[in-house]
Amino acid sequence: MYTGLLHTHRTVAYLFLLATVALILLAIFRRISGTSSTDSKQALLAKIALISGHTQLLLGLGLYFLGPWFEQLTSNTAEVMKTAELRWFAVEHIGANLVGIVLLTIGNSKFKKAADGQSKDKAVLVYFGLGLLLIASRIPWDRLF
């Protein structure tokens, strides 16, 4: 079960990264070109980014509580905190990604409530951008590919 969750978690990561990067690039392009109309592509990308991000969170929580990190953390916290790799997975990876998903959720709410295209683009650039930056800083890139 753990292996299946891990493979699904890695696969959904690609969808999340693709949708979020595309959404941010679209917002940048719209800001540069001065386009202020609302775009259904932008709303679809925001929805895909949010859903895949939340799916990643749920899969990650499943991996966290079913995997070796949580077991080691609960049995020997001091040793986990001393070991860089264990601390990274047990604390830093999950903490940063949780905050990143919260930023995406806030950004999606502001995106949906925004009255005009510029406000939507600003919500995407600020919240989705910061969320992606935070999440990307804690992705185990050596294990993703």
Predicted regions and their residues:
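Membrane-embedded alpha-helical bundles that constitute the cytochrome b-like, heme-associated redox core
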Residues: M1-F145
